[in-house]
């Protein structure tokens, strides 16, 4: 595995981890269905209606903008079809924009840095976050700690 691929994959994994945290708060970087939210919470990523995982798309492509390849803020989640559309129908085409799946609009970054996906409040959140409930915050913190430990354990097993 090349260094570029390893860095890119780490950024995508980190972006999914961040998305999981957002979903736990009733938020996300796109409008996830309740089923997709549940998948993010339980499996670490979302799946489309055909059971295919959403893909992490480097808005500023890793090939053309290697300085951004390891940054999880440069990742947006798209279905395979949306991802291909973001590349103008050819995977070899570099990207330098945010792709809006509902409108198919591309918001070009030009010579500037990427702009991270907007965090939105989900219309149908599966997690209800009580206001000012410290016990919930403690449970969430403990779950996050356990999730991090599990991921570290799995990484050690793979080595």
PLM regions and their residue ranges:
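Nuclease and nuclease-like effector domains acting on nucleic acids or nucleotide cofactors
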Residues: 1-55, 60-158
